[in-house]
Amino acid sequence: MNSVLSEIHSEGSIALLTIENGAKNLISEPEFIEREKLLAWLEDNPQTKALVITGKGRHFSHGADVSLFDAANVSSISDNLKKGRKLLDTIEHLPIVTVAAVNGGCFGGGLEIAMSCQFRIASSKARLGLTEVIHGVVPGMGGMERLSRIVGREKALQMILQGEMLSADKALSMGLVTKVTEEKDALPEALKFAEDIVSSVSLTQINAVINTLNRAVDGHSDPSFGAFEATLEEAFGK
């Protein structure tokens, strides 16, 4: 049973997924929403062009609930992390726009979740970091790889080994966040940001562009022509 309460609902073509688990939205299960549940919801809501992920209340998520580590064996922790990694890989490869609305603390697994999104809109009071080294471990859900791709290998290495917690402005200067907002505006600005991107394009166009860029990142060569053909058929094949 997943003890993290994650709610997803639709606002027109924009879906909002909210993480809720106490004041700090701790991730007591790496699979903070069941992967199959998320995919089923998106299948049942085919009008969805964008997904915004946020944390309820003051914080996005302070990451793993480390108090549970003592009660679990290494094997069960590893199995749970594999589920969490698979979920974040799924979010990263969704063929729709994904935006994290980062309010307050966004640490460890919380930042790993945010980095699985294509964009991160942060409150001016947000703090972000992969802080796992403080607890004697390293990020286990793909966060090291994603951070390296986003900010570069050298900056990622320094951040991870020092467990550095960045201000929103510093994260912006490094390219870790897309935009910094006023203290309480991260979520409304993220919703507006998503709406501005998707409002004038079709779902076919969104799918084509995102799938092409994902394939390029994954090492596939020349994936763009198939995407062009898909949009060509939609635009002129009637």
Kindly give the residue locations of the regions a language model identified.
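C-terminal long alpha-helix characteristic of the crotonase
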Residues: I121-A126, V177-P223
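Glycine- (often His-adjacent) and acidic-residue-rich active-site loop
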Residues: F32-I33, A40, Q47, G55-D89, ...
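Conserved CoA-thioester-binding segment of acyl-CoA-metabolizing enzymes
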Residues: M1-K56, D89
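Glycine-rich beta-to-alpha active-site loop
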Residues: L88-H135
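Short helix- or helix-capping micro-motifs
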Residues: G63-A64, L147, K155-E164
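Well-ordered beta-strand positions
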Residues: F119, Q158, Q162-E164, K170, ...
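Hydrophobic/aromatic residues within transmembrane alpha-helices
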Residues: I53, D65, I113-M115, A171, ...
